[in-house]
Amino acid sequence: MNSNPKLSYAIAAILSSCAAASLTSRAAAAAADTEVNSEAIQEVTVTAQRRSENAQNVPITIQTISADQLKQLNIANFEDAVKYLPNVSFATNGPGQGNIFMRGLSPGSAGNQSQSSIASFPNVALYLDDQSVQFPGRNLDILAVDMERIEVLEGPQGTLFGGGAEAGAIRYITNKPKLNVTEGSADASYSVTAGGDPNSAINAVLNLPLIQDHLAVRAVIYTDHRGGYIDNVPSTFTRENTDNGTFRFGIGPTAGECPNGLPPGAPAKGLPNGVCVPLGLPVTNNLTVAKDNQNPVDYNGIRVSGLYQFNDDWSLLLQQSYQNMEADGIFAQYPIGSDGQALQPLQVTSFTPAYDKDKFENTSWTVNGKVAFVNVVYTGGYLIRTTQQVGDYSNYARGSYGDYYQCTGGPGTVAKTGPLTCYTAATDWNDWTRNTHQTHEIRFSTPYDWRVRGLFGAFYENFQIQDDMNFNYKSVPGCSPANLAVALSGGPACAGDVETNPLSTATHPGQRGDTTAFGEDLQRGYKQDALFTSIDFDIIPQVLTLTGGTRWYHYDEFETGSEYFTSTSCANHPNPCPAGKNLDAIGLRKTYNGFRSRGNLTWHVTPDILLYYTYSQGFRPGGFNRETGLSLVATGPDGVKQLFKPSSYAPDSLTNNEVGLKSEFFEHRLQVNLSAYHMLWNEIQDPLFSPSQLGNTTFVTNGANYRINGVELQLVGRVTQGLTVQGSLSYNDAKQSNDPCLTANNPASATFGKCITEIVNPAGILTPANAVFGPEGGVPAFSPKLEYNVRGRYDWAIGDYKAFLMAGANHVGGMFNQIDNGTTNFVGNPTTTLLRYFQPGYTTYDASAGVAKDNWTVEAFGTNLGNSDASTFTSSAQFIKSEVPLRPRVVGVKIGYKF
């Protein structure tokens, strides 16, 4: 190809003139910087590219919340922070039970039961400094005390932050010890919750130098109590003709009426006129656990760090963190109670105690040094986290399998002998987990002022989960010697207790309790090795820079343990009944490896205006599904099951193309950042659970592809002396780009190799199959089109006092809780924990005002001033429609002291 010399000369002239103008303006800016501009927007330093630099110079979309802003906005945890972060969604069932999503990259979310065993690994990385603390289904709930900042890095960060950063990364950056500085602070607050119990918090920080120029320590201690605000109101639970499992009794109506005088439920095989419950079944009540404001939560923690400066080049930072979180009750409201009664906002009907205990300790270390001209950083960490959670699962009794586990003597119950008998519906699930997470990373980098500069690193990670999860919804008595004798003599039947497989790896081996119907005692995790590099080349120094980087990764993933459930062979069987499945013998192991890369072109039009283009790739590892005896499901029209559930699922991937502007005007009094992106998310990891069609266990498979287009705007303005206005906005348009189907893979089925379109349900009726992957053009979960926030703060002096007034608003657009999976906004008896609901948009308002004098600060604050009870996460996770509402209006006072 012949080049056009005139065009080449024109391009060269334009770039040369831009470079000259840029260098000239840089010199002027440098001279101007010698004069302090008190009205300029404060520069924010981040380490998003593994080096300290001004956030305005980083060619990706970054949102930051500084230490001052964390205090000003009364942000204690991520649930408080997310309202100031457009394009970031947070689906949570309560404290310590959250999933974080960015830019609408979510297949949906569910309850926390079994998430440690079956959930995909997160696609948003969560970091405490340089230590990864992410976890499937329940990201670490870190109280944001004595933090330097929170960084939110949007878009794939796979090159520098690895597999968990497919959609982005969130980094909590702690304050580090300061040499030769003695300082400290203390804050205390008290507030009241509308319609709920009061809240209180105290924290204290001390920085203490021990050896001049060499050693300092920093410690923070905190306690935070948040009062409950959701009432567990008195209720009953009565088995109904319309329950999904009523067919198991084998009773039909007479002249269109059931024995209880009510219309029948849906027809079943052999019962074409509908199904009925028998008379005389027990009615369950919750009088022993009904309570007002039943969902308080307490955080207690301490963090101690020490910095030793060996010389000008080498230092060692050690940090130890402990946190204990204890929450009671349920953090959702039920629009409809367990017996179909309409409830008021902030009410539930729960029948068993519920609580969540979440404790972690984290040790981390960082060595900074220099060898000749090469900067060296070695960092590592070791996290130990344990959780113990119990949740009410009484509404499972209305599902397709509830009566199987809770009744005997019917043709579809676990034991078909003896009189027709049902037991209590008050049941729960109990999930104990232990997570260890060890990481090591070493990075070498050249001086940043070199024209060609680079970063090279190596990474090792060992991530393991132990999960002992028991679904305690079997109320049929266990087969103790006495119960078994009664059953064998013609009395009510019993069901033997389940146990782990004696040949498998088990955290808590042995027989489970009488009420355990199904569960798993398993271990899962991976080891990862990675190498990564990033190289910058200044095409025109200080003006035009080209960056390229890549990461090679290698995952060794495993799963071992035991799974067990109450089969019909447990009927009238001495405790324990036949042992659970041995996962060790299956050999669940997978290896994933490959490269993920990124590239940037950064153009400093002037020192205060930056344009960039970024190409980046992200990924997350695959995983394993439950391996029970129910792996063949979806009975077809010919009576043959059509689908072998996959034993594993593969990684999904994300490709991002992004352009952006970062700029400051009017002597750094106005900041305007704008970005636009086009992303392709392929073969997403899609969780499926449909007891009426696909069996009674959840599994994950690779499903649809999505195309995401969006824009994001961030504004900060120093309008007048003392007045700052800032806001941010995101618009996200995400659509499914293909139309896959669930394909029959059983060679014995007449539909083998074809899309599954019909399935015989547990009641024996042929029904249309749900389009579990959704149609082309469908939208993903937690992907609101529009989000924005705006706030203003005015600071002024009153004599010796410094006063401030701040107010803000936050809007979250409507969104769905699941992908378009063939289910609807259902209120009655959910057939799955993954029903799709629409969550309407909402707007909240906050305000604060205060004064400071010398070392003291006093302020009054209010959050959710409009007292909205909008749902932040709607689901059928506990077999009843539940909505996790915003915390009601909180009004309080905070006092601070620093020295």
Task: Annotate each PLM feature.
Residues 195-327, 361, 434-439, 445-461, ...:
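Transmembrane beta-barrel wall of Gram-negative outer-membrane proteins
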